[in-house]
């Protein structure tokens, strides 16, 4: 891979050297350096170059473009920037902690929070040097009131805590005597307790320098007269005033000075003096010196590192804005803009969070020359300064303040003070939102208001919008979508603007003024949301109504189905209860008719054969009359059955039997009956003629002739005595009275049953007819129908 890259680089260099005009010697030397000296390699390289030129003529040997470096993304750029800031912060922290401090505290953070430090470091530094904000104390993870001085020193310096009776060599200290302090040269006091020479004014420098300067022998003694020096000093002062007025305000900031380095306070090391009464920060839970910031509202302690992390929320729409808070409400601001409420207290949630700081009763480290009492506190001893400031300073063990201090107080430092760019960020966010709103307004105008409302394109566009809305919305025509709502609002807005504007302005001003556009957009948005809510409510109500109607129809269908099923079952049960009674009554009538006819024929045959020429026809009517008057009804023949009673009986039985299916048992019975009675019963000959009745009578006579000869008396007794055998029990349903299940519209059957013989004239033929009576009637009905 490396060789290929080298060849490409060489070929590119050779190509550039070959085609360049007036090339420098450096390029020629480079070309000679890369040219091979060997003949074989030279020939091969020439052949290769020739081949490459040939490829170039064909367009195949074009040189590759140099690979472009991948552009750095925004995330990578921000990550690299954060890494650089962290490295610079660590370096500055090490330098500041080594060289600078304020009353034993530091001017840089101690790494409790690892996030970005977006507060103004210059302002925080100035407030700490002015002793209006607590310095960044070093926090202790653990603290015990029984610790000794060297243990407190080790904890404050970040060293491992030694044993109480063990003093490490690096923690040994020796209190300096006053004589050594008095022997310090005045130049050191001048440099440490006063403003440095470079930072003094020009008049002050000139005056002091003229005093220390030796008198030149060329000058006359009169040059140093008081009058001349006064005039010259006055001129210098006026010049300094005029020049200082032209300097920028940043150069007028107070100058820092280094107070004398005294590591002891009241005979104790400064670390032991600070941390002997350590207090815990309720937010980061680290132990600090008792000289912490106190909240202005609830007088709660808070360290500076936690305080600088509290800030205003990012700019956001006013939905979450508290309308009850009158302090943050500005009537001059237009509605609908982004807002950013002041930070609230983390303890009592009171807005305009601010802190107050009471410094310790000594001064060490950096200070400003313009601050009052700096020199007095620096020159005085620790004991005298402590005794003089006990009355004026706040003791950490005093009673907590119960009155809230106003956020406008000079001693209160708010979160907006350490982040003065919050207004700039809010303005930038509002400007960005305004640009977005303007872009949205332009799109809105281009989409809905650029066309002439009265032109031919307006109805088409409106119809297209409505058609699109009908396709998108599930409700179709009944449920308008947000597109219809927007079109309606735009149309109404155009009509309103056209009515309010003059005829001349209506053609030029397509959009409302910028001042009122935001308000109108908010109104339109609210109306659009209201219309959408109404649409959703109507759609929900329509869906609920459709669902309810569907449930109602389903319930009605179910009830109808159940009613049909109940009616069908009731009809089936009614038919089952009616058919056996009708069939039994009809079959009993037929049996009685057939038995009566058979009995009459047998009596005729017996009377003709048994007698010896004696004509017994005369007394027969009398005997039959007696029997009919006593126990029997009148005799009925087949011809008599051809009347209305028999026809109605057959029609009723056929009508009832047509509703039932023929079972296998009934088919077997019908076959048995047909074999017993012959072809005359199941034949297809019509029953309404005399031949059919004669054939039936002939069949019954042949059956009677087959009976063995018996005495006339026995036969008469057997024919005339009441039946008390099993046939009587089996024929009991045939002689029953008409039941309640029998149809009331069949009076013939009732008459026939009432006129049938009751348990009289039973015979074997009658038994067979009774057994097969269930199939005799359908055959007769079919024969009648045919």
UniProtKB/Swiss-Prot annotation:
Residues 1-46, 59-97, 201-229, 314-337, 383-406, 448-482, 494-520, 542-693, 705-786 are annotated as: Disordered. It is found in: Cytoplasm. It comes from the Eukaryota. The keyword Cytoplasm applies. InterPro entries: Sip5/DA2 (IPR039301). Residues 7-17, 62-97, 314-333, 542-574, 760-770 have a biased composition (Basic and acidic residues). Residues 201-217, 645-656, 682-693, 712-729 have a biased composition (Polar residues). GO terms for cellular component: cytoplasm. Its main location: cytoplasm. May negatively regulate the SNF1 kinase. This is Protein SIP5. It comes from Coccidioides immitis (strain RS).
């Amino acid at each position: 891979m490396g060789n290929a890259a080298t060849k490409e680089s060489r070929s590119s260099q050779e190509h550039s050297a070959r085609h360049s005009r007036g090339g420098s010697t450096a390029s020629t030397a480079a070309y000679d350096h890369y040219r091979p000296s060997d003949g074989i390699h030279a020939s091969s390289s020439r052949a290769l170059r020739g081949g490459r030129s040939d490829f170039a003529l064909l367009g195949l040997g074009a040189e590759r473009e140099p690979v472009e470096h991948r552009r750095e993304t925004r995330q990578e750029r921000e990550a690299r920037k954060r890494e650089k800031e962290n490295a610079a912060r660590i370096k500055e922290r090490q330098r500041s902690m080594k060289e600078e401090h304020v009353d034993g505290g530091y001017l840089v953070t101690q790494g409790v929070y690892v996030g970005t430090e977006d507060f103004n470091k210059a302002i925080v530094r100035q407030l700490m040097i002015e002793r209006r904000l607590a310095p960044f104390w070093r926090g202790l993870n653990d603290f015990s009131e029984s610790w000794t001085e060297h243990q407190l020193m080790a904890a404050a310096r970040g060293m491992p805590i030694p044993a109480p009776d063990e003093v490490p060599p690096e923690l040994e200290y020796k209190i300096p005597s006053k004589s050594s302090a008095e022997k310090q040269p005045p130049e050191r006091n001048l440099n440490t307790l006063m403003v440095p020479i470079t930072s003094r004014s020009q008049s002050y420098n000139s005056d002091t320098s003229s005093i220390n300067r030796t008198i030149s022998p060329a000058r006359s003694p009169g040059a140093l007269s008081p009058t001349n020096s006064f005039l010259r000093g006055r001129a210098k002062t006026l010049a300094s005033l005029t020049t200082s007025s032209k300097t920028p305000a940043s150069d007028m900031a107070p100058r820092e000075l280094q107070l004398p380095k005294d590591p002891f306070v009241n005979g104790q090391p400064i670390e032991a003096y600070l941390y002997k009464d350590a207090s815990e920060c309720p937010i980061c839970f680290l132990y600090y010196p008792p000289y912490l910031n106190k909240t202005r509202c609830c007088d709660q302690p808070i360290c500076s590192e936690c305080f600088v992390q509290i800030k205003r929320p990012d700019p956001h729409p006013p939905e979450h804005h508290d309308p009850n808070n009158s302090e943050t409400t500005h009537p001059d601001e237009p509605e609908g803009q982004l807002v950013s409420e002041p930070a609230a207290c983390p303890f009592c949630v009171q807005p305009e969070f601010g802190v107050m700081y009471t410094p310790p009763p000594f001064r060490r480290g950096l200070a400003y020359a313009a601050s009052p009492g700096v020199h007095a506190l620096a020159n005085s001893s620790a004991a005298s300064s402590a005794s003089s400031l006990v009355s004026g300073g706040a003791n950490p063990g005093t009673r907590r303040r119960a009155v809230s201090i106003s956020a406008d107080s000079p001693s209160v430092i708010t979160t907006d003070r350490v982040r003065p760019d919050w207004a700039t960020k809010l303005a930038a966010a509002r400007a960005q939102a305004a640009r977005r709103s303007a872009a949205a307004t332009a799109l809105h105008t281009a989409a809905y208001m650029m066309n002439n409302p009265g032109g031919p394109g307006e109805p088409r566009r409106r119809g297209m919008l409505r058609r699109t809305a009908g396709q998108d919305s599930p409700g179709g025509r009944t449920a308008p979508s947000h597109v219809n709502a927007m079109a309606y609002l735009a149309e109404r807005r155009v009509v309103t603007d056209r009515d309010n504007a003059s005829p001349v302005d209506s053609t030029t001003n397509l959009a409302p003024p910028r001042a009122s556009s935001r308000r109108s957009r908010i109104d339109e948005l609210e109306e659009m949301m209201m219309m959408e809510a109404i649409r959703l409510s109507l759609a929900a109500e329509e869906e609920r109504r459709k669902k309810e109607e569907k449930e109602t129809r389903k319930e009605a269908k179910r009830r109808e189905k159940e009613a049909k099923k109940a009616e069908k079952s009731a009809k089936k049960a009614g038919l089952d209860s009616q058919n056996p009674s009708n069939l039994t009554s009809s079959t009993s009538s037929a049996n009685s008719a057939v038995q009566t006819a058979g009995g009459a024929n047998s009596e005729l045959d017996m009377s003709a054969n048994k007698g010896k020429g004696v004509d017994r026809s005369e007394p027969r009517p009398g005997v039959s009359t007696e029997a009919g008057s006593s126990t029997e009804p009148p005799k009925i023949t087949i011809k008599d059955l051809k009347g209305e009673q028999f026809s109605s009986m057959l029609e009723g039985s056929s009508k009832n039997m047509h509703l039932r299916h023929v079972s296998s048992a009934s088919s077997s019975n019908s076959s048995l009956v047909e074999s017993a009675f012959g072809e005359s019963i199941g034949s297809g000959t019509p029953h309404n003629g005399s031949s059919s009745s004669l054939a039936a009578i002939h069949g019954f006579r042949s059956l009677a002739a087959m009976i063995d000869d018996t005495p006339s008396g026995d036969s008469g007794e057997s024919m005339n005595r009441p039946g008390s055998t099993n046939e009587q029990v089996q024929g009991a349903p045939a002689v029953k009275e008409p039941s309640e299940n029998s149809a009331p519209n069949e009076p013939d059957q009732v008459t026939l049953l009432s006129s049938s013989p009751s348990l009289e004239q039973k015979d074997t033929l009658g038994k067979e007819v009774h057994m097969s009576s269930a199939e005799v009637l359908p055959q007769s009905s079919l024969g009648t129908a045919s």
